[in-house]
């Protein structure tokens, strides 16, 4: 009887050890597959769960980013000290209109089509399908290398660039974004000579070197039809004004500004001040969403309070501070707020 009890107890003990071993193995395997980081690797006292985000992997709670997501001295994804910025910024909206986001939300479609209403309506998706047979229709900014620093210069057209001597500094950036006319020849010392991105609409378009990306800012379906025509048949010569029938740009570098991103800026950032944001605002927020570091040149008035373009000799030629289309004062306020939030560096010029 004693022998039987001893055998029974030994059997139970072996069974218990076997069950505990199974439980430990299962628990260890399950923990290894969960999206957590071990506290030892972080030098902390808690496990940290990772969640997907536009700027990289982020730590839950108030500790900020788990790690730097770029190699710049400051990164767009760095922990923000500005609740204002965090409440406005949405990294999930792509600034580029592509095959993947062709279908606009109904409210965006209605708003965009009213910017420059046309007598004849067009099926936007059909127009885009034809356009994307000519230009890539892909998002070139989808992936970011955290080991690199993508420094971007957003160069406006303000007269405060005259005599600034910013040219060499501007040219040192990875991306140099300009808009509309923006001549560089003869102004290299102040505005730089390099351009990587040129933002234009049909009525302001000009030929570009092969190494420059043409970013079309469309206000209507006809603008999409125009760029397709200008890169092929040359049939469209007029929108609401004469336009170039043919355009010499690199087809592989043509990008289309996303109307949903356009409206996001109008709703979240400029808050419906003016009918829609200025081209300068559109380019600035494009940069904020694709760059690691953003430096701003040539925005606002000059040191005398005059609003004009750097290629104009008449300092009073550009009195556009507040119109029915744009509210330059409010946009200047947004730029100041972004600078205070350490999201941009603003170079005021002369």
Swiss-Prot record:
UniProt note: pH dependence: Optimum pH is 6.4.
GO MF entries: beta-D-galactosyl-(1->3)-N-acetyl-beta-D-galactosaminide alpha-2,3- sialyltransferase; beta-galactoside (CMP) alpha-2,3-sialyltransferase activity; protein homodimerization activity
Expression sites (tissue/organ): Strongly expressed in brain and liver and to a lesser extent in heart and kidney. Scarcely detectable in lung, pancreas, spleen and submaxillary gland. Expressed in L5 dorsal root ganglion (DRG) neurons (at protein level).
Enzyme class: transferase
PTM per Swiss-Prot/TrEMBL: The soluble form derives from the membrane form by proteolytic processing.
Glycosylation (residues): 211
Pathway: Protein modification; protein glycosylation; Glycolipid biosynthesis
GO CC field: extracellular region; Golgi cisterna membrane; Golgi membrane
Highest taxon, organism lineage: Eukaryota
Gene Ontology BP, a term: globoside biosynthetic process via lactosylceramide
Effect of disrupting the coding gene: No visible phenotype under physiological conditions; due to the redundancy with ST3GAL3. Simultaneous knockdown of ST3GAL2 and ST3GAL3 results in markedly fewer offspring and impaired nervous system function at weaning. Knockout mice show reduced nerve injury-induced neuropathic pain in response to noxious stimuli (hyperalgesia) and to normally innocuous stimuli (allodynia).
Spans traversing the lipid bilayer: 7-27
Catalytic activity line of the entry: a beta-D-galactosyl-(1->3)-N-acetyl-alpha-D-galactosaminyl derivative + CMP-N-acetyl-beta-neuraminate = an N-acetyl-alpha-neuraminyl-(2->3)-beta-D-galactosyl-(1->3)-N-acetyl-alpha-D-galactosaminyl derivative + CMP + H(+); a ganglioside GM1 (d18:1(4E)) + CMP-N-acetyl-beta-neuraminate = a ganglioside GD1a (d18:1(4E)) + CMP + H(+); ganglioside GM1 (d18:1(4E)/18:0) + CMP-N-acetyl-beta-neuraminate = ganglioside GD1a (18:1(4E)/18:0) + CMP + H(+); a ganglioside GA1 + CMP-N-acetyl-beta-neuraminate = a ganglioside GM1b + CMP + H(+)
Xref: Pfam families: Glyco_transf_29 (PF00777)
The entry's keywords: Disulfide bond, Glycoprotein, Glycosyltransferase, Golgi apparatus, Lipid metabolism, Membrane, Secreted, Signal-anchor, Transferase, Transmembrane, Transmembrane helix
EC annotation from Swiss-Prot or TrEMBL: 2.4.3.4, 2.4.3.2
Ligand binding (substrate): 116, 157, 180, 240, 276, 280, 300, 309, 326
Ranges per topology, Lumenal: 28-350
Main location: Golgi
Sequence ranges on the Cytoplasmic membrane side: 1-6
InterPro entries: Beta-gal_alpha2-3_sialyltrans, Glyco_trans_29, GT29-like_sf, Sialyl_trans
Family per record: Belongs to the glycosyltransferase 29 family.
PANTHER family, alphabetized: ALPHA-2,3-SIALYLTRANSFERASE ST3GAL I ISOFORM X1, CMP-N-ACETYLNEURAMINATE-BETA-GALACTOSAMIDE-ALPHA-2,3-SIALYLTRANSFERASE 2
Subunit structure and binding partners: Homodimer; disulfide-linked. Homodimer formation occurs in the endoplasmic reticulum.
Protein name: CMP-N-acetylneuraminate-beta-galactosamide-alpha-2,3-sialyltransferase 2
Source lineage: Eukaryota, Metazoa, Chordata, Craniata, Vertebrata
């Amino acid at each position: 009887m004693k022998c039987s009890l001893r055998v029974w107890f030994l059997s139970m003990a072996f069974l218990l050890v076997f069950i505990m071993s199974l439980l430990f193995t299962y628990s260890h395997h399950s923990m290894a597959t969960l999206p957590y980081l071990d506290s030892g690797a972080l030098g902390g006292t808690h496990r940290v769960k990772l969640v997907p985000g536009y700027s990289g992997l982020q730590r839950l709670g108030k500790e900020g980013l788990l790690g730097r997501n770029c190699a710049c001295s400051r990164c767009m994804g760095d922990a923000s000290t500005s609740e204002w910025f965090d409440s406005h910024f949405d990294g999930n909206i792509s600034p580029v209109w592509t095959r993947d986001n062709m279908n606009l939300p109904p409210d965006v479609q209605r708003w965009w089509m009213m910017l420059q209403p046309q007598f004849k309506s067009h099926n936007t998706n059909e127009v885009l399908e034809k356009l994307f047979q000519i230009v890539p229709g892909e998002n070139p900014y989808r992936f970011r290398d955290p080991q690199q620093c993508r420094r971007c210069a957003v160069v406006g057209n303000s007269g405060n660039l005259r005599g600034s001597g910013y040219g060499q500094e501007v040219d040192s950036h990875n991306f140099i974004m300009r808009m509309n006319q923006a001549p560089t020849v003869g102004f290299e010392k102040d505005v730089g000579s390099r351009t990587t991105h040129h933002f234009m609409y049909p009525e302001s378009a000009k030929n570009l070197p092969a190494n420059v990306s043409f970013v079309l800012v469309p206000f209507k379906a006809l603008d999409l039809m125009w760029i397709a025509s200008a890169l092929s048949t040359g049939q469209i010569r007029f929108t609401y004004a004469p336009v170039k029938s043919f355009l010499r740009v690199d087809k592989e570098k043509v990008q289309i500004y996303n109307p949903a991103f356009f409206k996001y800026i109008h709703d979240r950032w400029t808050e419906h001040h003016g009918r829609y944001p200025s081209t300068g605002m559109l380019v600035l927020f494009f940069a904020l969403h694709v760059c690691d570091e953003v430096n701003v040149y040539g925005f606002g008035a000059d040191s005398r309070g005059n609003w004009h373009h750097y290629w104009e000799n008449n300092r009073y030629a550009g009195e556009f501070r507040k119109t029915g289309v744009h509210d330059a004062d409010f946009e200047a306020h947004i730029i100041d707020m972004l600078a205070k939030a350490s999201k941009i560096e603003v170079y005021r010029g002369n």
